[in-house]
Swiss-Prot record:
Pfam families, alphabetized: GDC-P (PF02347)
Organism: Xanthobacter autotrophicus (strain ATCC BAA-1158 / Py2)
EC supergroup of this enzyme: oxidoreductase
UniProt KW RNA-binding keyword: no
Enzyme nomenclature, EC number: 1.4.4.2
Keywords, alphabetical: Oxidoreductase
Encoding gene (name): gcvPA
Protein's name according to its UniProt entry: Probable glycine dehydrogenase (decarboxylating) subunit 1
Single GO biological process annotation from the record: glycine decarboxylation via glycine cleavage system
């Protein structure tokens, strides 16, 4: 496709249409001394070899997660991904394919989406799941909007121990939808009161388990209180591996279950792309966002797969759409599906137990260090460590010793006042030597 630049007449017509007299007036918000009036003189291009060397030098400033003892979590977790996963998702049939609008030539894609949905539904103990969302936080925001549609109410209650990034995503979406959000304060040291705020004006209560501090939450009394008030319970998780060991949200009364699927089949990927999981009850399926792949038979009675539901704004009237999701996270969903298939139910449980055992061992070691304490009574593979003084300083000192010790909670919520807390994760990738090194280094810096 050729690039045809604007003519002076084209530019004048466009400026007149938006009500400005010149390009300078269009960019009046940018200080004059910050504007470039001519293209900068760029250095001559380098050879491919020189570019590779330059990028390698820059990359060398990073600390790869696998090169040091690594205990960072807070919503994204380092797990071992079998080589089979990466090998299969790089097949051109999957890597380059787009939305399967033509089922007659996209049966492979539709079938893996169907299998993905089945796995997510079984993992969460729900009746139906969609073909993925962008990530966990946007899935949570879509869940709140869905709850508003189902209940015809506009008020959501967010647990204080919901991940701050999930909270801010929900608040951003709600702000532009003119919805009300009641966000409770974080409560890392005790059980949250999530029942008192629920009344007959609330559409949903959003609860994370394991929560951002690592606590396991009993969802049953919250679900009972929500249903009694005519509201829905939206259950959130950031660590999908936990569902291999704990009671799934669907079995505890959740109406919508959303979460992050990154930790199964997907690497940390420098923060993305990730894959949002979304499951709900069958009776709410027509209010569910995204796409739904379904099983059917063709004219000759052969089994096949199609997009059963796809009520997004590209397909129907915008005001009737349940979401405006576009390409979603299909390749990440495929990676999730392959890894889950390799694990199986027994393998997932074994993986979850290994994670829990590693975290328990680490918690015991760190709690024995004078000045440090673990604030959780129950947790899966992540817990909260309380240290004297600013947690960010402790994390920096440990990093200087080659230990990536975790995430200061203040980094996620700078105004929370909880400056002495570190979120610490231990997965199957952490070794006993790693955990011993952490405890020894912590003893030195406190």
């Amino acid at each position: 496709m050729r690039y045809l630049p604007l003519t002076p007449e084209d530019r004048a017509e466009m400026l007149a249409r938006i009500g400005v007299a010149s390009v300078d007036e269009l960019f009046v918000d940018i200080p004059a001394d910050k504007r470039e009036t001519a293209l900068p003189r760029l250095a001559l291009h380098k050879s491919e070899l020189e570019v590779e060397r330059t990028l390698a030098r820059l990359a060398g400033q990073n600390v790869p997660a696998g090169s040091v003892p690594f205990f960072v979590g807070a919503g994204a977790y380092r797990h071992h991904v079998p080589a089979t996963v990466d090998h299969l998702i790089q097949r051109s049939e999957f890597l380059t394919s787009y939305t399967p609008y033509q089922p007659e030539i996209a049966q492979g894609t539709l079938q893996y989406l169907f299998e993905f949905q089945t796995q997510v539904a079984e993992l969460t103990a729900m009746e139906v799941a969609n073909a993925s969302m962008y990530d966990g936080s946007t899935a949570a925001a879509e869940a709140v909007l869905m709850a508003h549609r189902v209940t015809r109410r506009r008020k959501a209650v967010l647990a204080g121990n919901l991940h701050p990034h999930y909270r801010s995503t929900i608040e951003t979406v709600s702000r532009y939808a003119a919805d009300e959000v009641v966000a409770l304060p974080p409560a890392p040291f005790g059980e949250e009161d999530l029942i008192t705020p629920i009344d007959d004006t609330v559409s949903c209560v959003v609860v994370q388990s394991p929560d951002v501090f690592g606590n396991l939450v009993d969802l049953k009394p919250i679900a009972e209180a929500a249903h009694k008030a005519g509201a829905l319970l939206v259950a959130v998780f950031t660590e999908a591996v936990a569902l291999g060991l704990i009671e799934p949200p669907g079995a505890q009364g959740a109406d919508i279950v959303v979460g992050e699927g990154q930790s199964i089949g997907n690497a940390l990927n420098f923060g993305g792309p990730y894959v949002g999981l979304f499951a709900t009850r069958q009776k709410f399926v027509r209010q569910m966002p995204g796409r739904l792949a379904g099983e059917t038979v063709d004219a000759e009675g052969r089994r096949g797969f199609v997009l059963t539901l796809s009520t997004r704004e590209q397909h129907i009237r915008r005001e009737k759409a349940t979401s405006n999701i576009c390409t979603n996270s299909g390749l990440c969903a495929l990676a999730f599906t392959i890894h889950m298939s390799l694990l199986g139910k027994t393998g997932l449980t074994r993986l979850a137990r290994a994670n829990h055992a590693a975290a328990c061992d680490l918690a015991d070691r760190l709690a024995a260090v004078k000045g440090a304490s673990v604030v959780n009574d129950t947790f899966f593979n992540e817990f909260t460590l309380r240290v004297p003084g600013p947690a960010a300083d402790v994390v920096e000192k440990l990093a200087a010793k080659g230990i990536l010790a975790g995430v200061p909670y203040s980094r996620l919520a700078p105004k929370s006042g909880l400056d002495d807390l570190i979120l610490v994760a231990a997965t199957e990738t952490t070794t006993e030597d790693d955990r011993a090194a952490y405890a020894a280094a912590l003893k030195e810096v406190l």
